[in-house]
């Protein structure tokens, strides 16, 4: 784990750890030149298993490839990839706000219907973009409240593209057992669909 104050790639100062996932750690960093806040995702080399024939490193760099193509206000922009001291990193926009999970858990009342519908429409718009803006549909496979950010302007952004992939019409099934229990489709866990 990186300590606050660590300088990466002679460009970024680590401010703090802001997330941990199966594929890696996520840090808030600041650029040395203009003090802009960004996020750096570090590949976790303790991920030993191979998933669907792809190594953790292949999945990690595929995430960067997907993000480099995004041109939607509801998706963070990827700024680059780099290696530092034997570790691989993706640099992307820092999305300010709260996760939908945090909003739900901290609220004593249900999210108002009008607000929930607006967020649902924005999520559908982002998913429509992913499915229809590339040569093959991009399947976002980890939609859950902790991967949905609500910005201070009350706009939706989707984060964490580690298990996205292009739809392959030549395969009988297009899923593998990655995702979050309780949010992935049941057929995904059964190895179907």
List each model region and its residues.
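Conserved N-lobe ATP-binding subsite of Hanks-type protein kinase domains
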Residues: 25
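Conserved N-lobe loop of protein kinases adjacent to the ATP-binding glycine-rich P-loop
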Residues: 30-38
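AlphaC helix of the eukaryotic protein kinase fold
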Residues: 47-69
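Activation-segment/catalytic-loop signature of the eukaryotic protein kinase fold
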Residues: 81
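Conserved short submotifs of the Hanks-type protein kinase catalytic core
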Residues: 85-99
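Activation segment signature within eukaryotic-like protein kinase domains
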Residues: 119-120
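Protein kinase catalytic-loop region centered on the HRD/HxD motif
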Residues: 124-138
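Conserved activation segment of eukaryotic-like protein kinases, specifically the C-terminal portion
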Residues: 174-187
């Amino acid at each position: 784990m990186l300590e606050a104050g660590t300088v990466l790639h002679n460009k970024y100062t680590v401010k703090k750890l802001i997330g941990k996932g199966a594929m890696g750690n996520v840090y808030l960093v600041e650029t040395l030149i203009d003090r802009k806040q960004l996020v750096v995702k570090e590949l976790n080399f303790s991920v030993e298993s191979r998933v669907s024939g792809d190594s953790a490193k292949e999945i990690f760099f595929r995430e960067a490839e997907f993000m480099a193509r995004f041109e939607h206000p509801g998706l963070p922009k990827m700024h680059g990839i780099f290696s530092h001291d034997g570790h691989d990193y993706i640099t992307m926009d820092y999305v300010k706000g709260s996760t939908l999970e945090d909003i739900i858990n901290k609220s004593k009342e249900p999210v108002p219907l009008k607000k929930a519908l607006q967020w649902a429409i924005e999520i559908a718009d982002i998913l429509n973009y992913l499915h229809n803006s590339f040569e093959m549909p991009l399947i976002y496979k980890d939609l859950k409240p902790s991967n949905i950010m609500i910005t201070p302007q009350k706009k939706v952004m989707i984060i964490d593209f580690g298990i996205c992939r292009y739809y392959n019409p030549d395969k009988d099934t297009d899923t593998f057992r990655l995702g979050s229990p309780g949010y992935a489709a049941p057929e995904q866990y059964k190895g179907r669909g």
